[in-house]
Amino acid sequence: MRVLVAMSGGVDSSVAAALLVQQGHEVVGATLKLWGGPSDSGCCSVADVEDARRVAQQLGIDHHVFNLTEDFEDHVVRPYVDAHAQGRTPNPCIECNRAIKFDRLLDRADRLGFDLLATGHHARVTHEGAHRLRRGADPDKDQSYVLSMLGQDELARVVLPVGEMTKDEVRAWAAQIGLRTAGKPDSQDVCFIGRVEGRQGFLQRKIDFHPARVVDRDGEAVGSVDAVELVTVGQRRGMGHGADGQRHYVLSVDVPARLVTVGNAADAVTSRVRLPNTTMTWVDRPLGPGDRAVAQVSAHGRPAACSVAWNGDSRVVEFDEPQRPVAPGQTVALYDVTEPDAVVGAGIAA
C-alpha cells in the first residue's frame, strides 16, 4: 500500500517509517512546516526538518515538506491565544492533531493518491466492525488522549506503527538499525512557544494582560495577580496561603470581572464537568443518559470512573469520586467502561 508518514524528526515517527518500509509498503515521508516564528522547543524547528530528511534518506524513501503555516495559525495558534484571553485553558496539541495532522495532511494524502496516513503516536487503531482508537502499549507514553477527537473517517485511514511498542523498544529498534534519531529527547512543550520566552512572553506579544483581584470563597480580598489571562483553574503556584496556613488553589477565573477566586485543597475538587454537545466528537456511537465511562482530563491524568448525563445541549460527566477541578477549555476524553483502553469520544469543558 502507499503510505504517507508524518515525520516530525523524532524517534517515534522515524521508527514508524522504518517499520512500514520493512513491511514492504510504498512509503513517502512528509514533514510539516507549521510555525514561522522562533521556537526552540521541538517539532517545529529547522533541525527537526533536517533530522526527518536525513532519516528518510537513510531509509531510501522520498521526503517532502508541506507548508501549513497559515492553517496552523488559524486553527491552533490563534484559538490558543483567544482561549487565554477568555480565561480558558486550551490544549493546542489536540487541536493540531484534529485540524492539521488528521485533517489537512490526511486530505493531502488522499489527493496525492495515498492509501493510508501514518504517524508516530503511541496509540493503537483496531478495525473490528467499527474503527476503534485504543491506548498504546506503553502506559507511560500513551497518546490516545491527544487523539481522542478523531472519528471514524480519520481512523479508517490511519496507521500507528509504534502503538504496540514501548518507548524503550522504539529506541532500541532505532539504535539497532542505526537511525540518527535513536537517542533524540522527546519534545515536551508547546511547539510554537520557545523555552526562553515561555508562555507568558509569547502571550504578552499577542494580547493585553490585565491585573485582577484575588478573593476567597467569601469574597474577601486575599491578594492580586498581574495577568488574569495567565491564571488557570486548579493552579496553586503564586496563589499564596490562607490564614490557616493552607495553600490556596484557583477555583474560578472571571476575566471580564478581573476576578480570581481561590480556596483550600478541600475546596479544589469537583464532582462533575459539563461538555457542550457542540464540542463533542464520538469515535463510534454517542453515549446516552446514564451510560458509564472512564474519563481522563489531561494527557497523563489518572482515569476516573464516571456516569454521563444529559442536560439540555450538553453532556454532563458525573464522577464517582471527587476530582481535581477541570479548567474550562480542557479536553475530557471518555473511554469505554468495558474496554478501558478504547476511546469512546471527547468534549471540551465549559
Model-derived regions, located:
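ATP-dependent adenylation/nucleotidyltransferase module used to activate substrates
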Residues: 1-148, 159, 167-170, 175, ...
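AMP-forming adenylation/ATP pyrophosphatase catalytic core
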Residues: 11, 36, 118-125, 132-350
